[in-house]
Amino acid sequence: MSRHIQYSIVVPVYNEELVIHETYQRLKEVMDQTKENYELLFVNDGSKDRSIEILREHSLIDPRVKIIDFSRNFGHQIAITAGMDYAQGNAIVVIDADLQDPPELILEMIEKWKEGYEVVYAVRTKRKGETFFKKQTAAMFYRLLSGMTDIDIPIDTGDFRLMDRKVCDEMKRLKEKNPFVRGLVSWVGFKQTAVEYVRDERLAGETKYPLKKMLKLSMDGITTFSHKPLKLASYAGILMSGTGFLYMFIVLYLKLFTDSTITGWSSLIVIQLLFSGIVLLILGVIGEYIGRIYDEAKDRPLYIVQKSYGIENKRLYRDQHMS
């Protein structure tokens, strides 16, 4: 059955009742142009609105619509991972439900795939309808990731991309409890290329990636693919120790060889507060890594599916190959 489906379109959904019908219509119009078999795999990530009801209505009419319904909100990256677990196509496309990423670009991705590329990712050349603050924080996010991680993650890319079946299969072998999908796709390698596009403003609803979630995603990406924060913590410790010893020698020299002495508590308190802040920052960095090690050690399931619609293989590929 799996090889009879050429394309799987994975769509994570969280509170998208205002746009989900339009998303389905545009995806259907685009994929019908391929003249090949496809599936639209929606992953409902614990939506609290009518998203699941609207999706169910479409699945009853169109058998190509398949739904994974989480027991609660597990997060965008995990929803993408679940979609890849259940996808049956020879090529898998990940696209958000908010229509900021144009479904029409999928056809260009498919052409690149047919040319032999195994990963085709979309690069944003412009972002419509976003505030100056949002654009600047997004730019900082991508450049921070690029500078701090040990792999080459393309700048100004999201999770909108096409992956060959063998890329998806390799992704399923990874056991990350805090998956950072775009980083993992870069890590597995294979022949990759880019297509450029202008990102549209939201059709309706609110962004699902406010600053707080962007910071968490950035931390997940950095801690997953880099030891640089730990190295920076070590360098900071060396710098603090060196500064402390230098200050000690200055105080001793002034006391033993001159008539001058350093008086006043203000300078000492400032130095102590500065060093204490750096120590706490270092402990926080170490804590982030320890927390992720703890998540991996618990070995809990990545997500829980309370119900699925149109899915024939009820047992996860991940469970079949990881046991």
Curated annotation (Swiss-Prot):
Q: Where in the cell is it found?
A: Cell membrane
Q: What is its main location?
A: membrane
Which molecular function term from Gene Ontology is one that the record holds?
A: glycosyltransferase activity
> Mind telling me which InterPro entries this protein's record contains?
Glyco_trans_2-like, Glycosyltransferase_2, Nucleotide-diphossugar_trans
- Assigned keywords, A-Z: Cell membrane, Glycosyltransferase, Membrane, Transferase, Transmembrane, Transmembrane helix
One cellular component (GO) term of this entry:
plasma membrane
Entry EC number(s): 2.4.-.-
In terms of domain of life, where is this protein from? Bacteria
The record gives the membrane topology as: Multi-pass membrane protein
Transmembrane residue ranges: 232-252, 267-287
For the protein in the UniProt heading, the enzyme class is: transferase
Q: Which family does it belong to?
A: Belongs to the glycosyltransferase 2 family. GtrB subfamily.
Q: What is this protein called?
A: Uncharacterized glycosyltransferase YkcC
